[in-house]
């Protein structure tokens, strides 16, 4: 469940103030949309969703460790995006070349960089319509490949090259030309 935090117009947070808000409230998952609206996701997630998320992170991390192609992030990460939003996906991956272009101070904060790949995992309390809108915003900001994983429907929506494809959990998902060589079957990661 995502709750909007109402802030007077004159009270729009700067990036530094938003980071301070996040640090002062580590138990909350805080994001900002492109209009400056602060969004708070209730924490913690349910046990099953947390387990699924761990499995997804493990698979992407394992592929990346073998290929040494970039950096993997979990659901505690966040990124400042070109539309002025700050978003945190459940899983993110950034190519090594792009990650290495950041300064050390950027790497130690919330960086202004768009992940190459993200995964959003629908929890029991997430609204699928809102998640689909969020996926569209990820793509508009420059994410090259995005997966919306829905244990409820046993499907993954794949966003790539301006198209959306629905892949049933029993079929193989590929990393396209972004995570080259990655192949996963969601049914083997997420129990129905």
Where are these regions (language model features)?
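Gly/Pro/Ser/Thr-rich low-complexity, intrinsically disordered segments predominantly at protein N-termini
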Residues: 1-192
